Amino acid sequence: MIERLTDEDIIKTALARIAELIDAHGEWLYAQGASGSVCLRKSECDFRVSHRRLHFSCWTHQGLVIWRINGWEWTGEKLLLEASRRMGSEKARLELIPRASARAAAAAINDSRRERCYRLANLACAALRGAKVERASLSAGARSNQPGRYARILLRHLNRERIAVAGMVAGAGSHDTDAFLSSALIWFMRLRERSARPPYIRKLWLVVEKDYAEALAQTLALLREDLRHVITLLQLDDEWQELTPVRSPELEELWAQQPERFRRPPRDFMSESAEGIIALAPEAIDVVRARHGETLRYHGLAFARVRRLMDRESVWFGIEGARRRLLDETTQEEWSKLLRDLKEHRSAQAADQHHALYRASPEAWLEAELRRDITRLDPGLRLAPLHAQFRPTHVGSGSRPIDLLALRRDGRLVVIELKVSEDREHVLQGADYWRRTEIYRRHGHITRSRLFGDAPLSDEPPLVYLVAPLLRFHRSFAQLARAIAPQIEMYRFDINEDWRAGVRVMRRVTLTNNWH
C-alpha cells in the first residue's frame, strides 16, 4: 500500500528506508509509463530532501529527470513511487526494479497484461452478437524485451466485417491518452491498408477506463469526419465487467463548453537581481516570469530563481536536481563556478556534447532560441510579446503548457509545438493545444487578458506550427497528420539538425492542404 509523505518525520523515515533499499542492490531498472526503462547504478539514484519535500533524480535517455515523490511502496520486488513535477501538472507512477529480478518482473507484467487483453477481447466479443475473437495480442513494447501497454484485438462479425479493438492494459498517466490514440490510429490505418480480402476491417473500437474517457472523447472530435464515424469509444466499468458507449462531441460542440478558469500570465516586470544576472551573459540568459518570482535560464536550462519577500529580493541558484543555494557572500565561489560550467558546457561550441549540461532540457534550449528571434521560424510572426510555455489553466489541472503562443502580423494566433527527438504524439498534442487555445479565443479570454497588448486579434482559429529537426519527425507523422480535421490548419517546419548554433528553416509543408 502506498505510504503518503505528509509531514517531515514521515519523509525522513521514508528517505532512510529507501536509501537502505537502493544500497542493497548494485543496479536498478528505472521505468516510467510507456517511455521504456533505463538501467541505473545505485549511485545514480539520487534521493534527497529539499524544501521539506522528497525528490528523486536520475539521468535517462532524455536527460536529467527530477520528480517530487508524494508516496512510496516497497512490494518486495520493486519500489513504487507516486511522483509529480511541473508544479503538479505532470504526475506519474515510477518503478525502480532491482536488476536481478527485472527479468522475472517483466515476465509477470507480460502475463498480467496478456490476461487483461484476453478479458477485453471477451468483453468486446460479448458486446456484439455474432462476433468472434480472431486475434488478441499486445502491442509492441518500447523495447524488444518489454511487454506492450495496449491490447490489439480483431473481431470477426458474422463473416461480414472485422472490427479492430484497442484498449489500455497498463497503468496510464494523465497525459497518456495522446500516446494511446496515436498508437491505435497507426495500427488501425495500417490494418486497413493491408486488409486486401473480405471481410474488411472498417471499424475501430477504443476501450478505456472512466478516468480517460472524457479526455479521449474531446480529442476524437479533432479527427477528420470520415475517421470519427468509424471509431467507437467504449468505457470500462471499475470491475472490468461491462462496456458502455461514450459519445464523442462534434467539433462545433466544443465551443459551447464553458472553459476552465483562465490563468492570466504574470505582469511584465523584471527585478533588479534578474537584470543583473542577465547582464552577465545577455546572449544566453533569459527570464521566465511566474506569479511568485522569476526563473533565470541559460539557453533554456533553469539555473537561478529570484523571489521577492517583504520588499527584499533573494536569489537561489543550482541546476534542477542539485541542492539550491542562497546567493550571498558565502556562496559566491559556487555561483561563479556554476556560471563558468554553463558557459563552457552549455554552448553550441561545447567540446563535450555528452556532458550533462549540454544534454539537459533540449526542447527548452530550442524554445529559448526561438524566443530570442521568432522570425527565424516565420518572418510574419510578431517578435514580441511572445508567450513561452503558455498554460491557460491552473497548474494543477493536468493540462500541459503550450511551448510557444505567438501572434502573426495579420492578427492570427499561432500555436507552436516543438520537438527535438522523435515523438509519436507530436501531431495530436499540437491539435489538442489548438483546441484549448481556440476555446479561450472564442470566449474572449485572450483579448480581455491583453496577452498581446493592444494588437488586434483576427476572428479566425489559430494556426499550428509543428517544429522539429529535419531527421527527428516520427516515421508515422504523415499518417497521423492525415487523421486531423481540415479545420485545424497545420504546418510542418523542418529545421536544421545543428539548431543550437542558430535556427534555420530547411522546409515548410502545409499539412492541411496536402492531406485533405
Predicted ranges, named:
Residues 1-516:
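Charged, terminal alpha-helix-loop-beta segments
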